Amino acid sequence: MEEAELVKERLQAITDKRKIQEEISQKRLKIEEEKLRHQHLKKKALREKWLLDGIGSRKEQEEMKKQNQQDQHQIQVLEQSILRLEKEIQDLEKAELQISTNEEAILKKLKSVERTTEDIIRSVKVEKEETSGASIEDIYANIPDLPKSYVPSRLRKERNEGIEDDEQNRKALYAMEIKVEKDLKTGESTVLSSIPLPSDDFKGTGIKVYDDGQKSVYAVSSNHSAAYNGTDGLAPVEVEDLLRQASERNSKSPTEYHDPVYANPFCRPTTPQREKATPGPNFQERIKMKARGLGKDMNGSIHTMNNGLSEERGSSVNHISPIRPIPHPRSMTQQAEERPHSPQKRQMTPWEESDVTQDKCAPSAKSQLSPGEAPVGKSERQGSSPTCQEDEEDVRYNIVHSLPSDVEDTEPVTMIFMGYQRADDSEEEKKLLTGYDGIIRAELVVIDDEEEEGEGEAEKPSYHPIAPHSQVFQPAKPTPLPRKRAEVNPHENTNHKSPHKNSISLKEQEESLGSPIHQSPLDIQIAGDGTEDPSLTALRMRMAKLGKKVI
């Protein structure tokens, strides 16, 4: 009762205080209005006094004096009202201060008498314990057809309150250990691993950072000991995020699957594959005829000139690119496969072979290959007469590697490019050179050992005896094809070489070249001049500087 009275007194004091504050605010507004009127009347009185000095009539002066007296009276009344209002405001402020002091005293008494929330909760619990549950049971007893074993939920809750409050008796249904790494800069938490634990082995060690009645989260350090006491609690959003990351990590499959791979050869993709160097049906026969006369050495370099066109091998397609015939350096050592050659054709000289091929099938101008055509695979398209097809394709020549039989085939052969030699632009030569892609001719230079150098100086001169008239150094007549030479083919570049043993000797070559049948107009012209070839002169000078002799 005392507490209620104190509360009423406090509320009354607050109400009175509020009324006084409103009165004070109204009186202050009224004072402001009175002050404005007082100022206005003062200005009016001064103006009338100034006008009174300029009036000459007596009647008007009397009227002005009466008006001035009235204004002065109003000014005095306003001044008195202003003073009175100010005094009232002071009294109200004193009353407000008195009410405030009384309110503070009532509040102190109320705090001493008023119970705290804990006291109220405690008293409620005591009242519940004192009151018996007979009243609730009486209420449910009046309900018909109610089983005797039925216990109201309120009673069950009250009976189980003590057990629920005891956290040690609460058993965990599921436990999981989650290793979390927290970035101190961004504050983001990343789940490193999650390991489920049996609920029986779980021990609530650590500091509890979250508990909503269904889930409990404990902070444990890396060494499975309790974390430091300064661990902050987790918000429900953070707990849900960690559980989501852990569930996503567990749901990920450890194996990564890819598209099915089929080994069926019919399901092979249509992308271009790298072709293997396997000859076709007529490919090996063509190699037998064209590869004769080439060096067997593994380091020999081959360069084909076809009217300034050279075939180079790409990834899987043959590319034809126009380039100038320039000397290539010695190629890298590669493993080469020896191709079997027919012994009957090996015994034939290149001139006999060319005569035989011309008699069988004379190539026409239309059948010859143009510079832009590729010779690969033409024998497969025309398989009826392979000899004629090979003659048509054999317009392009390779380097002449005709070595004498006494030269060992194990030694490498090196060719030195000494320059070009131009032919006169005559009509007959243009006709003869139709389809002519260019043939490289080289001088055979044998460099002896130093021991044999002294013996050979007395017998052999230091220059070639028939250099101006030698057919080895002059361009041969292109009409009678001397012999089929191996092309630079993507499949023949490094793997097809013919032995030197099948090549004709130098003496036989000079005799065959010296015959009038194979002399070209260029040979006759140079022989008539009696001048030496500039390439031979340069070669002789170079050999003389090296101390070697030229055969």
Swiss-Prot record:
GO terms classed as biological process: regulation of cell shape
Domain of life: Eukaryota
Chief place where the protein resides: cytoplasm
Phosphoserine modified-residue sites: S135, S321, S370, S384, S385, S498, S515, S520
Compositional bias of kind Basic and acidic residues: 247-259, 484-495
Position of the Glycyl lysine isopeptide (Lys-Gly) (interchain with G-Cter in SUMO1) cross-link: K179
Pfam family, one: Paralemmin
Modified residues (Phosphothreonine): T271
Region (Disordered): 247-393, 450-529
Signal peptide, first to last residue: none
Residue positions where N-acetylmethionine is found in the record: M1
Coiled coil: 2-106
Keywords: Acetylation, Cell projection, Coiled coil, Cytoplasm, Isopeptide bond, Phosphoprotein, Synapse, Ubl conjugation
Glycyl lysine isopeptide (Lys-Gly) (interchain with G-Cter in SUMO2) crosslink, residue number(s): K125, K179
Subunit description: Interacts with GLUL. Cell projection, dendrite. Cell projection, dendritic spine.
Protein name: Palmdelphin
